[in-house]
Amino acid sequence: DQPDGGGSVSLTYSKEVSIDLNKNIVSLLFANPGKSNQDMIVQIVIHDSVIVQSGLIKPGNQVKTLDLLDSSEKKLTEGIYDGKFNILYYDQINGEKAIVNTEIPVTVTVEKWLQ
């Protein structure tokens, strides 16, 4: 339980992210556990550019693949990048964006996989 006006957040994630430039698909693990009381959006940021953004992730849900944002593939070449998850929190009742965000360092491997 949290105090009135407070929040409780719990995260499950992997710090390894991979991107397939042939399909513009991002493979990751990010979950908003059922005990959380906040909705979330996860972004992946490389070199201060948001390259991926999920939709709203409600407690008890997770994402394993996302599409690159339009033209993000033009900013990337094959290699390993230091990136970050940028987590945005939203109140489940009124949908207001929370003031606090979370940044988590991740390693992003960019490849062109065979079809």
How should these model regions be labeled?
Residues 1-45, 93-115:
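Primarily secretory-pathway and cell-envelope proteins
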Residues 84-92:
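Beta-strand-rich extracellular modules
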Residues 49-61:
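Solvent-exposed serine/threonine-rich low-complexity stretches and specific carbohydrate-binding patches
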Residues 72-82:
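Short glycine/proline/serine/threonine-rich loop/turn segments at secondary-structure transition edges
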Residues 46-47, 66:
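Short acidic/polar micro-motifs centered on Gly/Asp/Asn
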Residues 56, 67, 107-109:
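Generic structural detector for well-ordered beta-strands
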Residues 48-49, 73:
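Residue-level signal for glycine
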Residues 62-72:
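Exposed aromatic-hydrophobic patches
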